[in-house]
Amino acid sequence: MTKVLYVSANPKPTELSYSKQVAETFVSTLKAENASIEVEAIELYDVDVQEIDGDVLSAWGKFASGEALTDVEAKKVGTMSGMLEKFMEADLYVFATPMWNFFFPARMKMFLDSVLMAGKTFRYTEQGPVGLLENKQAIHIQGTGGIYTGTDLNFADAYLRQALAFVGVSEVTTVAVEGMNQYPDKIEEIVADAKAKAEALAKEVAGAVTV
């Protein structure tokens, strides 16, 4: 069974989020095309996502020294470990994010801080860091008000690609839902085009899944 982890990072409901609407098209098509696919959806604004703070850094230091964690430290690193476990178990990642000031929302960065973990998803060698995840791929569905594909201002997509490649996930496909603010009279056309691309991609991915 192929496991899909669908992660969205937008406090808006689906009907007000273009990236979520396109992501829902991808996920629903994926499940319709291949019943063996299991999807777990997480909206990062609806769950507890732990940032790296003083307690987390203290806990990491105690792991190395063997000291006991405080209850607060244990709870916080436990939250991060829960996200990490879901991430490691998945075969396919679907990320739906808006662009906010050239990046994605802070909660998405907090999620990545939970899953880029030395000894779990990558390790250090004398030749440098090596990703530990194999045979996984990712889809990034990104909503932007302007046109940012292929520009240096799209830090979010570039960062996500580099972060995933760092842990061994080098197959990343981006579906851009872009230009809604720049071309408000073409919103329906833009979203429909992105949904068509997402649907075609989902059929391709579903067809490649082996049970």
From Swiss-Prot:
Q: What is its EC number?
A: 1.6.5.-, 1.7.1.17
Q: Cofactors per UniProt?
A: FMN
Residues involved in FMN binding: 17-19, 99-102
Which parts pass through the membrane? none
The UniProt record lists the keyword Flavoprotein: yes
Q: How does it assemble?
A: Homodimer.
Give the protein's biological function. Quinone reductase that provides resistance to thiol-specific stress caused by electrophilic quinones. Also exhibits azoreductase activity. Catalyzes the reductive cleavage of the azo bond in aromatic azo compounds to the corresponding amines.
Q: What is this protein called?
A: FMN-dependent NADH:quinone oxidoreductase
Recorded name of the encoding gene: azoR
